[in-house]
């Protein structure tokens, strides 16, 4: 970034303000893509910074949302529902239904409750939705081995 444009931004918006170099972001994301190739899909977690959603849409295949608010922001910005992964440990029946109604087709399951919520909502629509089961590594998030095995049984 050049000093002159930054000075103009400070005059226009004051301080503090956040300024992102989208060209630098794109270069870094392309470097990551070169390293991982096409064998992996890149995912941006919206909670990191929702203001970067428009820039990230062209750089990653998936946007992870963890709340109804993040989902609404993505919908308002025109993010394709098939590019959204609905995640989060506090999902409710209403959240899952809203996401499905919006066209979201991929979900994470962090608990046996999430498995039931998503399964019941899918069945009520006569659909099958792919899910990612989150296995805990000893933290408070995710399912332990027994819960995970029960989920796939």
Say what each PLM segment does.
Residues 1-129, 133, 137, 149:
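A charged N-terminal "starter" segment
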Residues 137-153:
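Active-site loop/helix belt of alpha/beta enzymes
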């Amino acid at each position: 970034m050049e000093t002159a444009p930054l000075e103009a931004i400070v005059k226009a918006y004051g301080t503090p303000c956040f300024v992102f170099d989208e060209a630098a972001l794109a270069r870094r994301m392309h470097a990551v893509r070169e390293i991982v190739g096409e064998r992996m899909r890149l995912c941006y977690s919206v909670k990191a910074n929702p203001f970067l959603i428009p820039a990230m849409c062209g750089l990653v295949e998936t946007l992870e949302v963890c709340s109804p608010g993040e989902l609404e922001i993505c919908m308002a910005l025109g993010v394709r529902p098939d590019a959204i992964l609905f995640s989060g440990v506090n999902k409710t029946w209403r959240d899952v239904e809203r996401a499905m109604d919006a066209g979201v087709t991929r979900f994470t399951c962090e608990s046996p409750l999430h498995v039931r919520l998503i399964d019941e909502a899918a069945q009520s629509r006569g659909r099958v939705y792919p899910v990612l089961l989150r296995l805990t590594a000893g933290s408070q998030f995710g399912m332990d081995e027994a819960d995970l095995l029960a989920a796939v049984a």
